[in-house]
From Swiss-Prot:
PANTHER family listed in its UniProt record: LARGE RIBOSOMAL SUBUNIT PROTEIN BL34M, MITOCHONDRIAL RIBOSOMAL PROTEIN 34 FAMILY MEMBER
NCBIfam families hit by this protein: rpmH_bact (TIGR01030)
PROSITE patterns named in the record: RIBOSOMAL_L34 (PS00784)
Signal peptide residues on this chain, from the entry's feature table: none
GO molecular function, one term: structural constituent of ribosome
Keywords: Ribonucleoprotein, Ribosomal protein
One BP annotation, GO: translation
Organism superkingdom: Bacteria
Protein's name in the database: Large ribosomal subunit protein bL34
InterPro entries, sorted: Ribosomal_bL34, Ribosomal_bL34_CS
Protein family: Belongs to the bacterial ribosomal protein bL34 family.
Gene Ontology CC terms: ribonucleoprotein complex; ribosome
Length: 44
């Protein structure tokens, strides 16, 4: 049986990366929330 999580660095950064977040208004809100919370890492 094939496992559901097949890691790929490229796919990961394209969907959850910093530039993907900055591309949309809501993504920027995500980053702002994480900055406000004091997250060490903002995005993948």
């Amino acid at each position: 049986m094939k496992r559901t999580f097949q890691p790929s660095v490229l796919k990961r950064s394209r969907t959850h990366g910093f530039r993907a977040r900055m591309a949309t208004k809501n993504g920027r809100q995500v980053l702002a929330r994480r900055r406000a919370k004091g997250r060490k890492s903002l995005s993948a």
